[in-house]
């Protein structure tokens, strides 16, 4: 069923948005074989995914997702693409608790590890949070706690057809890009880390097409799909349809530079320990990189007018104990639901 699309992409031709949506519909309906899915994803990766193609894929997945509604008028997602291969701790997931502690609701979309040792779901489980709650419970958690984890397989059941081929080919594919673009709650504000600097404008353009209000799409010069503190980061801002790109350095907000080794992660247990330490107020590079990523997420949500103000909010979230309290509140809520 996917043969025509494979042939076109292998020939180096781009799919229209409608053609891309049709291809994803075929995959999500279970009408493509694992070999066809793997061939299609690999050919796309070699050609390079275009704005129309990614938009079509995202619209198809959004149509099939279980929607989540919330009472929060403003909320943010910190889901990135993953796939940067740098094996850091879970920076954006830790930052999500800092954002929530600062008073901005977070609908964190995520999954288990695909290419790293520990995905966001893996770390949250190590922190004591059951991740595969049904959608109605996730919605209540978001409304009552101000933070929830939207586990992709629960909301995007049809993704199961691509899971095997993705795992077996072991390379970054269009699906890495689709995580941040298919939040089931339709997060209007986002911080999106991408694994390739050439993707920041592309992903920002797709988010604009999909109706995002404000987003920061970021890539660290060290290869991180995060705002880094080891050197400059490429930042592409989408704000009410307008897109601009600039360079950020840690010195811009008075943060010291660090080495990539200072941000290293490990197993889910290791990463959970790092997250707990950061949220408890331990100072150092891990805290600094979490702070700056939380600051950009707070800026995306409109919680501050400047990055410096947003950074101060993030610092206060940790130092007041609010970020750690948000983690404990989420653990307690999920435990009470499961009891």
From Swiss-Prot:
GO biological process, one term: L-tryptophan biosynthetic process
Cofactor: Mg(2+)
A GO term for molecular function: anthranilate phosphoribosyltransferase activity
Binding site for Mg(2+) 2: 225-226
Catalytic activity: N-(5-phospho-beta-D-ribosyl)anthranilate + diphosphate = 5-phospho-alpha-D-ribose 1-diphosphate + anthranilate
Enzyme class (EC, first level): transferase
Superkingdom in the source lineage: Bacteria
Keyword annotations of the record: Amino-acid biosynthesis, Aromatic amino acid biosynthesis, Glycosyltransferase, Magnesium, Metal-binding, Transferase, Tryptophan biosynthesis
Pathway listed: Amino-acid biosynthesis; L-tryptophan biosynthesis; L-tryptophan from chorismate: step 2/5
EC number, as in UniProt: 2.4.2.18
Chain positions recorded as anthranilate 2 binding sites: 166
Residues engaged in binding anthranilate 1: 80, 111
Cofactor note: Binds 2 magnesium ions per monomer.
UniProt-annotated binding residues for 5-phospho-alpha-D-ribose 1-diphosphate: 80, 83-84, 88, 90-93, 108-116, 120
Pfam families xref list: Glycos_trans_3N (PF02885), Glycos_transf_3 (PF00591)
UniProt cross-references to NCBIfam families, sorted A to Z: trpD
Family: Belongs to the anthranilate phosphoribosyltransferase family.
Assembly behavior: Homodimer.
Role description: Catalyzes the transfer of the phosphoribosyl group of 5-phosphorylribose-1-pyrophosphate (PRPP) to anthranilate to yield N-(5'-phosphoribosyl)-anthranilate (PRA).
Protein name in the entry: Anthranilate phosphoribosyltransferase
